[in-house]
């Protein structure tokens, strides 16, 4: 329903949202980024290293993205103590669980690659077990700007072929639904089959 008249609250002018501060806010954010980059130098501007994870839900689980932090299992497999990891630029998420071997191996390899490239300027050289450079080298070290060790997504190659009758009759969505239902009921069906077998033996 449309009305030609303006249906406003009383004193509505006092509650109008304005965006006059937007350009200044943009400038403030940029200056803050620059100050932070100087403060954390020679550490990378992108911050800590994040793991490669799959998105949640059926819609996004085929896509990989950066996660919150490496799991304790991944750190252990890579031989990095969990207390040391945050001090050398590795994000840690103690709540994350590894649900697949492939995911675990991918992130362990990522940590090992980082260890191969990592250079540490420790406060106390005697306590570090990693590659150490003298403090004077810290002044000449260059800072990495932007993403480092970026996630490389696989590009699937398309193969063209003729559309066959079998392809037209195949209902992909229905097939996926059936397989998902089978997966959900597998436990109950196995239990029922075991009970039926037990009854037959009697």
Curated annotation (Swiss-Prot):
This is Large ribosomal subunit protein eL13. The keyword Ion transport does not apply. The gene is RPL13. The lineage of its organism: Eukaryota, Viridiplantae, Streptophyta, Embryophyta, Tracheophyta. It comes from Nicotiana tabacum. Belongs to the eukaryotic ribosomal protein eL13 family. Keywords: Ribonucleoprotein, Ribosomal protein. It comes from the Eukaryota. GO terms for biological process: translation. Pfam families: Ribosomal_L13e (PF01294). GO terms for molecular function: RNA binding; structural constituent of ribosome. GO terms for cellular component: cytosolic large ribosomal subunit.
